[in-house]
């Protein structure tokens, strides 16, 4: 039994590459996206923060949540926090929109120059995209791995309305059926 499952479909990963990308480079790009996803989740609880997120926060958002979605976004320039938030909620890792999510956890990572207004702007982009009564938990961390002037936002959205849960579940089950049929042919 699981509380939540994050689905990262291969065909969505393929949408991040050009047609001319070699298979070797395509797998490297896809591997990097998956690595960032895993790092994004582990960084939420292991990286000391200005505003900390801990395992209890993740449990609060993920427990009995069903399907969950995850996105990561990077931003630079004048609107870097808003751009990172928009990129995270429209990430190639997201099978469907985060609209309607009733559980949201997000982390804003930046350097010493990250401002409270940027945190507020990013939070506004994310909170306006989910259920108005959603349980929202966020944290902020200082990340030395980021380039100067860069902001990184990791979003996990869960507890979707039943119609969205069914859509995500059916997408996952359809993939399993295709994979099972392919295995039977070998």
Question: Residues of each region from the PLM?
Answer:
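Tubulin/FtsZ superfamily GTPase core signature
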Residues: 1-186
């Amino acid at each position: 039994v699981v509380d939540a499952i994050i689905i990262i479909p291969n065909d969505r990963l393929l949408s991040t590459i050009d047609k001319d990308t070699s298979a070797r480079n395509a797998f490297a790009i896809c591997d990097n996206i998956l690595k960032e996803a895993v790092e994004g989740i582990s960084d939420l609880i292991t990286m000391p923060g200005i505003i900390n997120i801990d395992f209890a926060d993740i449990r609060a958002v993920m427990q009995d949540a069903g399907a969950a979605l995850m996105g990561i976004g990077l931003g630079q320039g004048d609107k870097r926090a808003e751009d990172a938030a928009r990129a995270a909620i429209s990430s190639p890792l997201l099978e469907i929109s985060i609209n309607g999510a009733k559980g949201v956890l997000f982390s804003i990572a930046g350097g010493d120059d990250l401002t409270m207004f940027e945190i507020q702007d990013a939070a506004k982009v994310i909170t306006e995209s989910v259920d108005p009564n959603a349980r929202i938990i966020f944290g902020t961390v200082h990340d030395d791995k980021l380039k100067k002037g860069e902001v990184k936002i990791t979003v996990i959205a869960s507890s979707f309305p039943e119609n969205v849960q069914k859509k995500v579940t059916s997408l996952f089950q359809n993939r399993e059926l295709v994979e099972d049929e392919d295995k039977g042919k070998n």
